[in-house]
Design a protein with these regions (language model features):
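Short boundary/loop segments of OB/S1/cold-shock single-stranded nucleic-acid-binding domains
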Residues: 12-27
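Short aromatic-glycine-enriched beta-strand elements
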Residues: 39-50, 105
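A short macromolecule-binding patch
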Residues: 52-65
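A beta-strand/beta-hairpin structural motif
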Residues: 62-74
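Short nucleic-acid-contacting surface segments enriched for D/E, G, S/T with interspersed K/R
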Residues: 71-89
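OB-fold/S1-family single-stranded nucleic acid-binding modules
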Residues: 93-120
């Protein structure tokens, strides 16, 4: 029983947004998708953002599971497809450690449609 409690606590900590991301701190970036991975338990996108000082920063943006994204029509195929080379705008929950990491809240596709991927649920 004790092992189950420890394991379930670890699983909840792993899947909790609040541990890694500040869901009260939203940011927004526009850039070019470099890499897209639709995987479980969480997908990820790397986006190259051109900074005002002329440098580029690669941001790693986490998403929900491939299954959740597929239910939204978002993925490798479907009505909301994205691929490397696409220019997108992402609103995200910022990483608590200040690094260029985030959990995607919305993504604006090249055709200007905005898709909500997260509502800030602490167990997404």
């Amino acid at each position: 029983m004790a092992a189950w409690l420890v394991a379930s606590g670890s699983a909840m900590a792993h899947h909790s947004l609040a541990g890694t991301y500040d869901i009260k701190s939203e940011g927004k970036v526009t850039g070019t998708l470099v890499k897209v991975a639709f995987t479980n338990p969480h997908g990820a996108m790397t986006i190259k953002v051109h900074n005002a000082d002329g440098t580029d920063t690669d941001w790693v943006m986490t998403t929900g599971s491939a299954n959740t994204l597929q239910n939204l029509g978002f993925g490798k195929d479907g009505p909301n497809t994205v691929k490397a080379g696409d220019t997108v705008t992402i609103t995200y929950y910022a990483a608590r450690n200040g690094k260029p990491l985030g959990f995607i809240r919305t993504i604006t596709l090249p055709d200007k449609r905005e898709i909500t991927l997260s509502n800030g649920n602490s167990n997404e």
